[in-house]
């Protein structure tokens, strides 16, 4: 199964909502429970963000194989973030492909 990479920042309210959405999706069970997510803190792990340089501005941003699947936008509420995180999880697919 492919891994999602989520670039985030400590203290970011949109990142907190993305984590909340991930927890909710995993709690549903099934394929969502198995989706691996690699969390990268933009401030503490700058070297790990280098492959994504120029591909995002806002956090959280979610990537799969270097392709951006989601980038939060100012003002997004939990429902919008949940829908976008779910879309990213769905992109992984149950067999590890899109």
What residue spans do the PLM features occupy?
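Non-catalytic interaction surface on structured domains
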Residues: 19-22, 30-34, 51, 64-67, ...
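A short, structured beta-strand/loop element
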Residues: 52-59
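Residue-level recognition of the N-termini of beta-strands and the immediately preceding loop/turn
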Residues: 2, 34-38, 98
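Local sequence-structure signature of Cys/Sec-based thiol-disulfide redox active-site neighborhoods
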Residues: 1-28
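Non-catalytic, surface beta->alpha helical segment in thiol-disulfide oxidoreductase systems
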Residues: 58, 64-97
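Alpha-helix termini
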Residues: 26-32, 92-96
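Short, glycine/acidic-enriched loop or turn micro-motifs at the edges of active sites
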Residues: 11, 44, 68
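Thiol-based oxidoreductase modules, predominantly thioredoxin-like and allied folds used
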Residues: 8, 32-47
